[in-house]
Structure formats: C-alpha cells, structure tokens
Amino acid sequence: MSFFRCIGRSALFMLDPEHAHRLAIMGLKSGLNSYQKVVDNRLCVTIAGLKFENFIGLAAGFDKNAEVVNDVFHLGFGFTEIGTVTPRPQVGNPKPRLFRLRKDEAIINRMGFNNDGRQIVYGRLHGYKRLGIVGINIGANKDTVDKIDDYITSIAYFYDVADYFTVNISSPNTPGLRDLQVRDSLHLLMNAISQARNEQKKKHGFFVPIFLKIAPDLSEKELDDVAEEMKLSDFDGLIVSNTTLSRQGLRECTLRNEEGGLSGRPLFERSTIVLAKMRQKLGKKIAIIGVGGIRDAKTALEKVKAGADLVQLYSGMVYEGPDLAITILKEILQFMQKDGVESIKAYRDQRVEYWAKHMLSS
C-alpha cells in the first residue's frame, strides 16, 4: 500500500494545501510506493523526435524543483515536467496562495513561480540517470528587467539536461507575463528562443524540442495569432492550456473570488475547446499536449479525440489519488480492446469538429 493511501485523502485535506503537497513530495522521496506500472506498446507515442512510453504526463507545478524526478515514474506517468524554473530563486507570492475548491474538484493557485532557481535545479538534474522523459518548464523572474532574456539564457543553461522545454508565458500570477502572448511580443520571443536553441544545437550536437504553453483565456483572434506564429516558427508543439482566470460555473462560494489561476474539473471544457480550435488552426503535423481537468480515462481520451498527441494532469491527482495515471491507462486499454483499436494515436482528432465549434465564453 502506498504512503499516500496510508495517510488518506481526507487526512491530507485537513492540512494546509502547501503542507499536504510537501508531505506528498516527502512520501515519494521515501520510496513508499507499490504501484504496478502499465507497459503496453499501444500506449506509446512518438512526437518531436521523442518516444514516450505512454501518453500521460505529470504537468508542471508538482515537482517544481526536480526533487522527485524518477519517483513520479513509479506512479505510471510516461513523462514528467519540472518547474516552472526561473533564472534566480524566487519565494513566490505571499501565503495563503493555494486553495482547494472541494465542491468543484478544483484548485486556485497564485503561487508566483516559487522555485529554487536554475542553478540548484540544474545540479539535481546533471549526471542523473532518469527513468523517462523529463521536460523543463521555464519562466521569467517577477522582477526581471528583460523577460525574453530570462527565457533564452535558461535554454542555454538547461540544454544538456532537458529532454524538451516548455516556454511558460501563460501563468496569470506573474505581472505582465501573459502580455508575451500578444503577437508582436510573441514573435520577438519565439524568434529569440529559436535562435538560442539553434546556437545550443550547434554547440552540443543534438536537438531539444520546444513547446509553447498558452492560456485558455485567449480570444479567437489571439488564438489565430498564436497559430500563425507557431507556423512561422520552428517550435515543435503547443501545450493547451495553463490555468484560467474564469470562474464560470463554480459552486464554491467562499473561495471562488480568490485571485489566481483555476485548475481541475471546471477547466476541462474550456481547455478542450481551445485545444480543438488550435488543432484546426495548426493542422495535423504540429504536436499538441492537452492539459486541464483530466480526472479519469474518459476525460483523458476526450483530450486525444479533441486533437492532443499527449496529455498532462496534476489537479486530478489531488482529488483522485496518486495512482490516477495507472488507473487511466488500464481503462484506456479496455476501451481500445472494446473499440478494436491498436494504438492510442488512432483516437486523435475524432472529435475535433465537435469541440472546435463551441464558442469561447468571456
């Protein structure tokens, strides 16, 4: 029985959310996990030159500082993403800054990129034999003068230890960060990052893919702009989406007005609509990772049907337990058996039109 099951969700929920998260990290470090991984070639996906053991990843935010890189693979994930990591250490926003909306199975956070900084994180990754694909989610310091410089220097800093990079310009908790999604700024940023990657490719002799992570709160016109810039750039894929500022449909009255980004069950519909719209705009070749509101096999599969090559989750694990990825994979294999499907890739795009026709609410 796992450390988490021994403690129990109800007991963890009695703790402050950040204390509970710290306890989860400590539990993973202790190695008290007994999950049987699901290994099946039908779940494998290859994108951007990387072969993923399965299509479910752990989203950024859980292992911010690369403390449990290998341990999370014992929870069944096919890949993990650490961070967000900034150039300099950052304490983040004042506490309390993390809130559970239990009625909605949601989380509001205004963490503010709290992390140990890239020097310490690099030290944890360098020379470390990893059990799977590890992405590094990079961001800008809150007080930085030149945000673009923070990204391009982090590309250089982490290049030899990253399997892929995620450029996070969509967190709502760093002032001015989402402004980088505006087309002129986005164009400058993506060009600068592409140039930095090309320089590192020449220096190291190998290629590291780059993904752009966007917000779910963009307008149709802004999504068009992102799509056009993606087509013009040599970025390898898109991650849809980060947390939302919307509070539409929440049942929780007390905490709904807390500032910060909302994740969990209520984000599923909005993020899936944006995912499908971006698949339509980008075409079939550019890779997309779907994130937001995944809590079971049906929601994970729906992301794939809406156009995702891979999916990520985090908040769902808070409510459903640490074995969520394994549970999903087992049920997906049952779906595939029932549907006569030989690969998870066969489901991709089956419901793009259905989701893309939905209007984005304000």
Swiss-Prot record:
CDD domains in the record: DHOD_2_like
**What cellular component terms from Gene Ontology apply here?**
cytoplasm; plasma membrane
Chief subcellular location equals membrane
- List, from the UniProt record, the residues annotated as the active site of this protein: 171
Similarity comment: family membership? Belongs to the dihydroorotate dehydrogenase family. Type 2 subfamily.
Q: Quaternary structure?
A: Monomer.
Per its record, how is this protein called by name?
Dihydroorotate dehydrogenase (quinone)
| Organism of this sequence | Bartonella henselae (strain ATCC 49882 / DSM 28221 / CCUG 30454 / Houston 1) (Rochalimaea henselae)
Q: What is the lineage of its organism?
A: Bacteria, Pseudomonadati, Pseudomonadota, Alphaproteobacteria, Hyphomicrobiales
What gene, per UniProt, encodes this protein? pyrD
